[in-house]
């Protein structure tokens, strides 16, 4: 910063030019930086590992917790152990608590597992599992995945993996139902959905002309029965013990998980004529999707 001051009484008029030259020379000199001692001290502090007290006060999304440092460091490969390793800066709230910007509703369950291996109650398992994924607590994830309802979900998913377009079909159900309800300005929409386990159609009219088992049919025979039922969405076929009613339960449950109310009932079979006396006997279900 350049400071200008009035000439003193002792300066002579003849010195005005020399004074101006001197001022210009001073103006051209580069400013000398002044060391910021506080900034230098702050940088040195960040370079050194942060030290923590034995008892740690926490603020997790506005919910307060207190635990031992050793509890947070119990498993090395976790987010909490890394946070409190001293290698990272952790912000504090106005009262000095270490702040974690995460909903603290289930953080107590996380601490209970870190303290003594305690698992949450069944109705909290899914939510705690999500938190365990966020904090990367592998041992807790393994324990929860062997607990209901996550164990049942793994078995259910093994069945759904047999239907490669299950998720896409579920999205199609939602989109069609939404579009129809909006077009009709209606509270609900109805869809026709075909759910069949066996690919081979049957007929009540005569003795089957072809082999009834799919793996015994020739390729030419199979092509005679290829067709698309006149429905909105079709699921099947699959090879598993789980039957049509199991898949219907999965569809309704997954829609409910998204907050969508769905009722279904069988309204008959496709009954489309294929060849000779053969008609498609795949069951057709009417789904009623209620939006409000």
Curated annotation (Swiss-Prot):
Sequence segments annotated as region (Disordered): 1-27
Pfam families assigned to the protein according to its UniProt record, in alphabetical order: BTB_2
Main location: membrane
Record-level GO BP terms: membrane hyperpolarization; protein homooligomerization
Subcellular location: Cell membrane; Cytoplasm, Cytosol
SUPFAM superfamilies: POZ domain
Coiled-coil features, chain-numbered ranges: none
UniProtKB keywords: Cell membrane, Cytoplasm, Membrane
Signal peptide: none
Gene Ontology CC terms, in alphabetical order: cytosol; plasma membrane
Domain of life of the source: Eukaryota
Record bears the keyword Cell membrane: yes
Tagged with keyword DNA-binding: no
All copies of domain BTB, residue ranges: 56-144
Protein name (database record): BTB/POZ domain-containing protein KCTD7
Organism annotation: Danio rerio (Zebrafish)
Gene (UniProt): kctd7
């Amino acid at each position: 910063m350049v400071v200008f001051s009035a000439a003193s009484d002792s300066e002579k008029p003849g010195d005005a030019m020399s004074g101006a030259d001197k001022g210009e020379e001073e103006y051209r000199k580069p400013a000398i930086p002044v060391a910021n001692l506080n900034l230098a001290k702050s940088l040195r502090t960040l370079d050194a590992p942060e030290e923590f007290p034995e008892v740690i006060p926490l603020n997790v999304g506005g919910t307060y917790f207190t635990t031992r440092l050793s509890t947070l460091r119990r498993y090395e490969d976790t987010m909490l152990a890394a946070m409190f390793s001293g290698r990272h800066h952790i912000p504090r709230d106005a009262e000095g608590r270490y702040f974690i910007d995460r909903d603290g509703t289930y953080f107590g369950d996380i601490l209970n597992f870190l303290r003594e291996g305690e698992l949450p109650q069944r109705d909290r398992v899914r939510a705690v599992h999500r938190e365990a994924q966020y904090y990367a607590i592998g041992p807790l994830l393994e324990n929860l995945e062997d607990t209901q309802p996550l164990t049942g979900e793994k078995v259910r998913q093994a069945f759904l993996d047999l239907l490669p377009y299950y998720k896409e079909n579920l999205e199609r159900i939602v989109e069609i139902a939404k579009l129809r309800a909006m077009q009709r300005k209606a509270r609900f929409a109805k869809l026709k959905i075909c759910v069949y386990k066996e690919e081979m159609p049957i007929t009540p009219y005569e003795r089957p002309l072809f082999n009834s088992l799919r793996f015994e049919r020739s390729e030419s025979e199979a092509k005679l029965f290829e067709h698309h039922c006149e429905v909105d969405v079709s699921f099947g076929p699959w090879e598993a013990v789980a039957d049509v009613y199991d898949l219907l339960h999965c569809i309704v449950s997954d829609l409910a998980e998204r907050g969508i109310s769905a009722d279904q009932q069988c309204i008959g079979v496709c009954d489309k004529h294929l060849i000779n006396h053969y008609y498609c006997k795949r069951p057709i279900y009417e789904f009623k999707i209620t939006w409000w």
